[in-house]
Amino acid sequence: LQLYISKTDAYSEIGSFYGFGHQQAFLGYESYILEPDTNDDANTTYFSNLANCTFDQEYIYATRGYNGKITFNAAVQYEDNLFLGLNLNSHLLHYDRSTQLFEDNTNAGSLINNIDFQNTLATFGNGFSFQLGGILKVTHEFRLGLTYDSPIWYNIREETTQYVSTVDESNKRTIINPKIVNIYPTYRLQTPGKFTGSLAY
């Protein structure tokens, strides 16, 4: 007895076991954009069902998001000569990107005449940083300043979704919409830190 595996389940399992690249091959194969040279599991070569010639393409790219910061600060003064300040920062990051590619062709020999390929990416992150600075009044007229901006230590995770549809030479539409959210492992990102000095007289 052979169990039926839906395209949604297949897309999900391919992503879990083999990764993003294999999911792209799956979408191309199931939407008839690509065909394997041979129908066996060991095959690694494919050919396109679109004949070379002229293509009309439209590409839509949309982004939105925010990068926010919440700051807690404290300051102390020693006599009238030394001033110290500290900022503790909590960073929030959210970024959405959506892309859509439309492609049409009337090329002789093309089995596929229309492609609609959509991708979304959602990025979520939070981070921490601090600033520490001081001003030293050497004399009444002369001041030295030094500030350290720490790196921002981010924890970031990303999610993607995909959709593809094609129309073949007989005007039959094939839609591959897995409705699967690919959630990738959280990774860390660190921006550079810096020192800033100043003199005033």
Predicted region positions:
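Outer-membrane beta-barrel porins/channels
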Residues: L1-Y201
